[in-house]
């Protein structure tokens, strides 16, 4: 376990930063390119551990993929061209890979076995395997397909109209991807609208997708046609520097090419409501995935209540929002965030435990947390528990803590932001 020592940042964070490619879009670009007809070129790809796991799995199924830094070429096999893997498909730490790929494997007439690391082994798969089984896929795993490893024997599927108990883009996407080769029209209805990268990208690859309120539909039998994909910066990665810019004294940051998909910009809405000083300059209006340059500077924040429909739009940003709340005047309440319990760690528990070690006044609730601002943080030894977003949040916390902060298991940040610590160091000079 590698550790990192973070010293207080006395002169603020200043400068321009180009945010690495969006993880969600990078995964999908590789997967959709693999099952499309023709060659897909991806620019702005995120070469983090999770997305490299996706490349590795599809190579194992006979897809020709060449990756050179943030540029990837995928020679598509079409929906029916994937080959039965000779080895176990290892997704590493990537929940997106295992859940979306399960949808593709469910409609493919061969046998596969899918597993990941210790964190993946604890994450619930039944939310995906149950609807796929209803469509006709043969799936098994520990505790009747609840946990990995999963075995999948795909084949002829029938479309379903599925009402998901959770607002999850991974669940929705798995069902829609299975539906590409299912007989009939597949429909997924969610309690709240989740991120819509799958729908946008399927349309870019030539698939007709219908959206009606909280329901998404597609007809089986549609082919994907290769296209070039430009991946914007990941707003979830940008969130750490947005909060850093707001809470570290004497800071002014310009974040370039940040993805502004409206199903992902809850963090922007929350910072605005908390009183942060920032500007958003759109740079590619009309694109399938909008992007902007964001300038943010040190701000006086106030506590707010966060819950309801906005939660799926910022679920991954809650750890760093909690940190921002420790520096806000008043109380911040985060609720309706049960999904935090089934992330890389139980993020309710880890956020509360680690911020408490730094002197924050924060308490866990069943579906979120309550943060009492404003807290003066003090350096301590903390742990990411292998969770990239916890690791990065703690690094930003260390920048405003008195004395040094030691982060154990700091290399976890490489899952989504391999250059995070280098960028942080550069901006602090």
UniProtKB/Swiss-Prot annotation:
One of its GO terms (molecular function) is 3-phosphoshikimate 1-carboxyvinyltransferase activity. 3-phosphoshikimate binds at residues 23-24, 28, 168, 170, 316, 343. It holds the Pfam family EPSP_synthase. Phosphoenolpyruvate binds at residues 23, 95, 123, 170, 347, 389. Its EC number is 2.5.1.19. One of its GO terms (cellular component) is cytoplasm. The active site is at 316 (proton acceptor). Its main location: cytoplasm. InterPro entries: Enolpyruvate_Tfrase_dom, Enolpyruvate_Tfrase_sf, EPSP_synthase, EPSP_synthase_CS, RNA3'P_cycl/enolpyr_Trfase_a/b. It is found in: Cytoplasm. It comes from the Bacteria. Pathway: Metabolic intermediate biosynthesis; chorismate biosynthesis; chorismate from D-erythrose 4-phosphate and phosphoenolpyruvate: step 6/7. GO terms for biological process: amino acid biosynthetic process; aromatic amino acid family biosynthetic process; chorismate biosynthetic process. Keywords: Amino-acid biosynthesis, Aromatic amino acid biosynthesis, Cytoplasm, Transferase. It catalyses: 3-phosphoshikimate + phosphoenolpyruvate = 5-O-(1-carboxyvinyl)-3-phosphoshikimate + phosphate. Monomer. Belongs to the EPSP synthase family. Catalyzes the transfer of the enolpyruvyl moiety of phosphoenolpyruvate (PEP) to the 5-hydroxyl of shikimate-3-phosphate (S3P) to produce enolpyruvyl shikimate-3-phosphate and inorganic phosphate. This is 3-phosphoshikimate 1-carboxyvinyltransferase. It comes from Bacillus cereus (strain AH820). The lineage of its organism: Bacteria, Bacillati, Bacillota, Bacilli, Bacillales.
